Amino acid sequence: MKNIIITGGAGFIGSHVVRLFVNKYPNYMIINLDKLTYAGNLANLKDIENKPNYRFVKMDICDFEGVLKLMQEEHVDGIIHLAAESHVDRSIKDPFTFAQTNVMGTLSLLQAAKAYWESLPEKFEGKRFYHISTDEVYGALEMTHPEGIKPPFTTKASSGEHHLAYGEKFFTEDLKYQPHSPYSAAKASSDHFVRAFHDTFGLPTIVTNCSNNYGPYQFPEKLIPLFINNIRHRKPLPVYGKGENVRDWLYVVDHARAIDLIFHEGKVAETYNIGGFNEWKNIDIIKVVINTVDRLLGRPEGADMDLITYVTDRAGHDMRYAIDSTKLQKELGWEPSLQFEEGIEKTVRWYLDNQEWLDNVTSGDYQKYYDNMYSNR
């Protein structure tokens, strides 16, 4: 029996990782540790909440004593750390919360893992601390080819209809960090703490940096679910600047599969990039979402294009992110399983079929946040 804590397991990516591990490894005890902030939602895990190898614990990762006690009581062998404040816009409004959760929370987990595992006869043997991070820590890449060029790589996640790169360079694991937002600065700091605990104390750590995820259960402050929800209600679609910023997109279940593989087979002290070689300008992906929603709702194609509303750009908005995940593919054999067009179709269908979930998470405080972010821009 392995006893694994997954932090942030009620969130978007975390819930997919929890579900995968609970269903795939019935001999593991999966402990979902989540504070249940605005983006944490136990409804994301209704389908596995009664499984015998699953337990939910409501706890703040900054609670060192609580985490240490839980590790001792549950004889925890591994930690998969996803809990984080992750929305760049919120980090600009409230950087203190991001520093507290992403930096001090990670430090609390590291210190608890070190203290508990060092107390055991076997110490760190058979243990693992896996920290999930973001491609945003690398900074921004130049968009040297705004018209798009043929990319050097293709994966199963790459778009079949729109497979372009917007520059020659990609994020690789050996790049120096250059975070530009409070969010990415906090994640970069937490990454450094994880590596420092390996280098100083020998803690068996792994770090991964992933590109933008999309799929079911994502809180609708993020681009794709935000726009699906707004199109559904025929509300304006706020697009930063000219919509030219580029991101690499990966279906969330493929990210969860990568986490599973790296947790079990990745090398201690290594960093792995996870991405789909699937670059899209924001404005282009928005148009794909509009066409998909309109088609599935029986509206004329492009009927809601007039909802696109250009607003003042985000402060410090990085122009281009593009991940090179060649190392992960060559060393561990991972590659995405779902092509972009299929993933978008599944994603839009899920949100349209789960309107009660959307309505529940977009009530109350969400509307206040939305008005604060996008009114008068």
Regions found by a protein language model. Name each.
Residues M1-N213, V253, F263, N282, ...:
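N-terminal Rossmann-like NAD(P)+-binding domain of SDR-like oxidoreductases, especially those catalyzing
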